[in-house]
Structures are given as C-alpha cells and as structure tokens.
Amino acid sequence: MAALDSDSDEDLISYGTGLEPLDEGERPKKPIPLQDQTVRDEKGRYKRFHGAFSGGFSAGYFNTVGSKEGWTPSTFVSSRQNRADKSALGPEDFMDEEDLSEFGIAPKAIVTTDDFASKTKDRIREKARQLAAAAAPIPGATLLDDLITPAKLSVGFELLRKMGWKEGQGVGPRVKRKARRQKPDPGVKIYGCALPPGGSEESEDEDDDYLPDNVTFAPKDVMPVDFTPKDNVHGLAYKGLDPHQALFGMPGEHLNLFGGASEGTSHLLGDVGLSKGRKLGISGQAFGVGALEEEDDDIYATETLSKYDTVLKDEEPGDGLYGWTAPKQYKNQKEPERDLRYVGKILEGFSLASKPLSSKKIYPPPQLPRDYRPVHYFRPVVAATAENAHVLQVLSESSGKAGQDVGTHSRHQLNASKRGELLGEMPIQGSATSVLEFLSQKDKERIKEVKQATDLKAAQAKARSLAQSASSSRAQASTPDLGHSSWHLALGGGTVTTRANNFKPFAKDPEKQRRYEEFLVHMKKGQKDALERCLDPSMTEWERSREREEFARAAQLYVSSNSTLSSRFTHAKEEEDSDQVEVPRDQENDVSDKQSAVKMKMFGKLTRDTFEWHPDKLLCKRFNVPDPYPGSTLVGLPRVKRDKYSVFNFLTLPEPAPLPTAPVPSEKAPQQRGSDKSRKPSRWDTSKQEKKEDSISEFLSQARSKVGPPKQESSALGSKEEQAPEPRPDTTVDKAVDAQTDGEGSRPSMDLFKAIFASSSDEKSSSSEEEQDDSEDSQEHTEEASLKGSQEAAAGETSVVLAAEPEPCEPATPFPIQKAQIDEREEFGPRLPPVFCPNSRQKLEIPQKEKPKKSKERHKSKKEHRRKREKKKKHKKHKHKSKQKNKKSEKNSSSESTDSSDSGSDDGGPAELSPQELLRRLKCLPLRRQ
C-alpha cells in the first residue's frame, strides 16, 4: 500500500500557486474589493505604470528626481578598469523590468519559431538558395554554411517519425496492395475513346500474386492543394510585370520580357549549370566598344516601361482613322448625301439611322355618354328611422331612383335580438340584462317624461341656435349626422324661410336660387314630386338630373357656419386660477393716448413707443457694447401683473394734473416761485409748468375738447380763492417772469460751486487766480444790472399776482412751439424724476421777498473772496497759514449767510405748513411718465 501511495504521489502534477494553509481556528480573510486593490511589484512596492519605453516621463531611479539623492550619486565607482569588458549595448540594456515583463514592450515569452512549424521549408526556397550559391563569387560558398548549421525539424515531423512515418509516404492506414506505376507506352497510339491494352497491368498483377498476404504498404503521398484565392481579373496562370520592380527599379535595370516562364521555373528547380553548360567567367559583347561610341540598344531582349504612356491623353487627330478599332464614321462614308440632308447636329461617333423608327399607333379616345358627369357626387347618407322616413322617401322618389325599403336594415345596424326576431327565434328567458327592468312602472313613466322634456328643450335650443346663426352668408359642409339633424329641424321647425333667405348656395344664378327655394317650400309640405315641380322644363334630361342631385345635396348638407362652430366647441373644463395677466410695463396705460394721436394724425413723439429693454449679456458681448443694466437678471421687456378682468383696464381717464397755463392761488404762487428760485435747480430739474406740459394725455384732451382743466379744491385755500377778485392776469408780466426764471435757472448759484470745488479752487496757481479776478470784475457789473432788473420784475410780479385772481383760459401755445420746447429739454437725455430732499420743506417756505437779500449776501461773499485772493498774492511764502485763515473765513461767511437766511425766513415768511398739509400737497403733484 505504501508503494502504491508513493506512486500516486509521483504521478500528480500541481498547477499554479498553492494557498497558504490556515491554522486551526483561524478564519479565512475576506476578499479585498476591486476598488481597494493596489498593483504592486515583486518587491511589494506600488507599481507605477511608466518607464523609459512605456509612456510617461521617467522620474529617475525610484522616483528620486528633484531630491538630493537624485542629482548626486551616493557612491562613486570608477569604470576605467572595466573598459575592455564593455560590449555593444542593445535596447534591452536600457529597458526596465516593466518593459521586459508580460505586458511590456519587449516581453520575454515563448514565441513559436521555425522549429515548431507544421512543415519543413519549402522546396522552392531551397532551390533558390542553391541558385544563390551558384551565382555567388565563390561557387559553393553557401554549401559550407549548410553543412555547419544543424538540421531543424519541426515537432510534428519528429512525432510522425516516431510513429513510423518516412519521407515520401502518405499519412494514413497502411494498404495491402502495392501502389502501381502507370507508364504510358510511347509506341502505342490511342484513337477515340478506346482504352490501352492491359498487358503491363496483368504482368504486375502476376507479380503481386507472389507477394505474401501479410505485407502492407504505406499510402501514396498526396500533394497538397493550393487554396490561394484568385483576387485579380487576369487569366489563369497569368503573371504580369511586378509594378514595384518596373516602376521603382533602377533606371539601368531592364526587364526581360521575352524570357519564358519555363526558364524561370527551371532556374528555381535546379540543374542550371549542368543542363545548359553555363560557364563561369566574364560575359560581354563580342566586339569592343570605343570610348566615344555608344552601346547599341538591345531592342529584342530588353524593354522598359518608359516607352509606354502612363497618363491618359486626348486622342491625336487622325489616330482613329486606321485599324480595325476605327469608328464607323471613318469606315462608312458611302452615304454622305443623307448626312448633308439632316438639319440637326450629329454627335461625334454616331451616324444617321438608315431605317426609320416604327410609329406608335394612337387610338382615339372613347366617346362619352350624354349623361356622363365628370365629378362624382356622394349621396347624403340618411339613417332610416321613424322620424325621417318620409324624407328618405321624398329624396328617393324625386331623384328618379327607387330607394331601398325603409324596414330593411343592414347587418351592421342590427343587434342580436333584432336578428333573432327576423329569424323567428324565441327570446331567451333569463336574468334581466338592464337595470331599467328592475324599476317599477311608475318610475319608468317618470323617466320617460323627463327624457321627453329634455329632448324637447334640446330641440328648441337647436332651432333657436339655427335661427340665430343665419347671419352668415357662407355655407359649410358638415358631417352626415349634423346634416341629418339640421335637415330634420329645417323640415319640422318652420325655419325654411330663414334658410332660404340666408343660405344661398346658388347666389350667382338667381333663377336657380329661386327654384331651390321653391324646392325647400315643397319639401316642407311633404310633397313627393317637389323636385319635379321646381325644375325648368326647357332643360335637358342631363341638366335636370344634375340639378336634382345638387338640390338634394344642398338641402341636406348646407348648414350655417355658426351652428357648425357651436357644435365643435364646448365650455372650458378647467378655469385658470390666476386673475392676473402679464403685460409690458411701458404699454400699460398709453393705448388711448396713442390711438387718439393717430386719429388726429399727429404722428411723431406722441405715437412713438419707448420701452425699457434688458438685453442679454451675450448680446452685449457680441456687439461690444456695455450692459445698460449690469445688475439686472431680466431679459427682454419687464412685465407687470394686472387684473385680467378689471373695469379700469378699459377706462382711459386723463391724469388730474393742471394745464400748462392753469393759474395757481395768489398766495401759493409766490411761495412756489420763491422756493424754486431759492433752490437754484439744475438743468435736469423740471418746473411744475414743464411737468404739466409733458403730459401727453392732457395735451390731447385739450386739443380734442378745448375745455378747462379739472378744478382741484383744497380746504386750506378755498376761502382765499373766494375772497380774491377776478381780473384777467396780464400775459406780458407772465412772460417776463418766465424769461427771468429761465435766465436764472440756466446757471446754478455760486454756493453750489463752493460746496463742490472749495478745496480744489484754493490750490490753483497764481496765474489762474489773476485771470479769474479780471473775469469776476467784468461779471460784477453785469450781475448788479441784472439784480436791479430782477428786483423790479419781482416787485411788479408780486403786485400783479396779489391783485389778480386766476381764471381758466384756453391754451394759447400751439403744438410746434411745445414740440421745440420738448426737444430742447430732452437735449441731454430723458428727464429725471423730481428729487425731494429733506431740506425741501425749508426751501419751500422761503418767500420771494427774501431773494434780494440773498443776492446781496452773495455779492458780499464774492468781495470777501476777492480780498482774500489779493492777500494770497502778497503772502505767497505763507501759504499754509493763509489756507487756514481762508477756511475759517469761509466757514464764518457760510454760517452768516445761513443765519441771515434763517432770520429772513422767520421775519417775513408765512406760517409753517403742517405735515398733513405738506403730505396732501405732495400727493396732488402730477407724476411724469417717461
């Protein structure tokens, strides 16, 4: 048993790497998931997938590039003594271990070579080697190499030899009879299909009789069949020129086109030197060639492709006149007269036909019958019911064709019970098939009454809608069901007159329309010969039948368009929850003004739309323009939501702003004018008069109605308006006041310049200061003259306004003047909304009487500035001290001016307004639309 165990152990072969045995009580480790596995080399280091030849940049010896060890070697070993041992390095010496591994660029793996080939070398290759040896400078030099090199046999060759196979024998089971050799007898000639005599075979058979029975022979060796596919268009066994040798060979090389293929094969098969008796030595021409003579071309034995055309060219004239390939136009020139008679152009390479073409036989068209209709009209399909049975009968009889029996039904209109009744079957007594069968008789009668009432209401509603929809003159064809219902209503509802009056399918032919209306009247009466009575007897039978069909189809299918549309539309199933709709913000209230301006033919700015449009950021980038709204997230027109169904959407009321020439109360006017003058608005600020003129809707309402402005009554000013007299204000005084306000508003006050440019004006050079002093001297005289004029105008203005009471008057300024004013105001862009600053209340309360005091204070401050500048010229060395003094004096002057203005307002100003009154006035101010 022990011996058997040892033998069995020796016979076992282990494959792969065995697992490490587990200790007792130790659990097997869990497999590591794929994402946690790492690739390591044989030394346990992380493998990096890059090397000198495997892609990526080498990071040095163990990735030490950039470190101290990577730049300087740790130990220096001289290689001077090992110079003799150096050998030629190959690519493998520069490769890493990864490159020589299984997945590298030069894996060291077992590769199949010639030793493991399935067959020996080809005989043709061996013969080629023999030829190379014969043509070598030293004949037979390659034979020595063949003697030295060992014979290489494949593994299959060795296996076959061990199995008893020998060269020249076939592979397979051995046979008993000997392979016979068939040698043809040269003296025997064979004629026809006769077989040769079998004398030689009989002699061989006699020889086979002497062989013992237990002798077997190897099978005959079979030559392998060449299964190379034919992938060209040449003939079988054709071998043309080698294009590589012919086109890319040396210019001195020639192709031997006349050397036979047998000679080439004989070279490959051997016996070259022996059969032809080739002598080795110098071969050349028989006669010598002089230095100045050229060698004759061997035109019979050599040929080059340079003598042939390699590019397709146009045929030279006259080349096609000769040879059997010439076209027929050169050969057949016997009938030139026929070609000359031909008018058209004969194409090159073609000639006129000698025989004419056979003409096609054309048959006449068939004759149409007299009652033929080129268009097929489909008859209206009317369901055969008890209600419209007489309609079907009238239609069938009037058209001259016998209609089908009303009682007969098609198979598609019958159910199982009706088919059973026709066949005479007894109905099956079983459970009730309908819920109505379980109801009592009273319930059934009540349901029937309700159904009749609903049917009656539906019929009345349809008749009413048909009568209402008779307003449209165009008729539309409907479905057969709709046509049937309208037909029934037209016959039974008494609406024939409305149909005849409104639906006129034959309006172009009044006589035909009249006959059609008569046909409808007779149809309503139920007369069977309605069509025959209406038709014209002078017409032919074909026309009468055609008109009969048209009348029947028109009476059936023509329904009013309103009833057709009402049957196609239903009420909405779901209502929208939102009661608001989005509209463009700038188009919300301008519709009525623009429409009225268009009616008055006042085109231009009144009908022009200005939208606030937010472009996309990409659009600004494409056109290289700055984004006008950089912080906006909107794209397009900003929209606001308003109520869908609101009464105010359809109202176009003018704004409650007063007219441009509307007067103000006597006490309110000086306060507002004084406040405007004291505030010194810039060119961007607009007065109330300009705001009133800017309202387009009010201007249009004035031009339309020529009425006064809406009166604004206030509780605080009502008593003062009643007490004031009513003389008409002088227009010349108002014009002077307007001119004065415009002149003063054109240039802002000096206080504004002081507040902005105070620090920068002190640091200017002395030369600029001298020029400013000269200019200020000239300005003083003009300002003093203007002050006197302004004081006088203000005094006259106050007296006139106090004595006068406002009276509504018509606008006197025409539209062109107003348009010019709007253009001047919008010269620097659109107007800005009015600014309400916290100090506006104090400025509004300053009366107009304090204006002269302010102008005097300004002159005083200017004189002080002038004196200080003169001091600066004298004391240029002490600039810092003078700057401090100037700042102190400026502060004192500004404080004095503010104190004086406050004291003036306290002394001469009216009582302060309450916050409620000020808020009410601010709400009454008209808003400007931009």
UniProtKB/Swiss-Prot annotation:
Region entry Disordered, spans: 1-41, 170-209, 400-420, 465-486, 566-596, 654-930
Record field: compositional bias (Low complexity): 465-478, 894-903
Gene Ontology BP terms: mRNA processing
Biased composition (Basic residues): 851-886, 921-930
Molecular-function GO terms, alphabetical: nucleic acid binding
G-patch domain: residues covered: 152-198
Keyword hit for Phosphoprotein: yes
Basic and acidic residues bias locations: 582-593, 674-695, 719-737
Compositional bias of kind Acidic residues: 1-12, 768-777
Gene Ontology cellular-component annotations: catalytic step 2 spliceosome
Crosslink (Glycyl lysine isopeptide (Lys-Gly) (interchain with G-Cter in SUMO2)) position: 313
Any one Pfam family match given in the protein's UniProt record, by short name: G-patch
Phosphoserine modified-residue sites: 6, 8, 358, 715
Family: Belongs to the GPATCH1 family.
UniProt protein name: G patch domain-containing protein 1
Taxonomy of the source species: Eukaryota, Metazoa, Chordata, Craniata, Vertebrata
Originating gene: Gpatch1
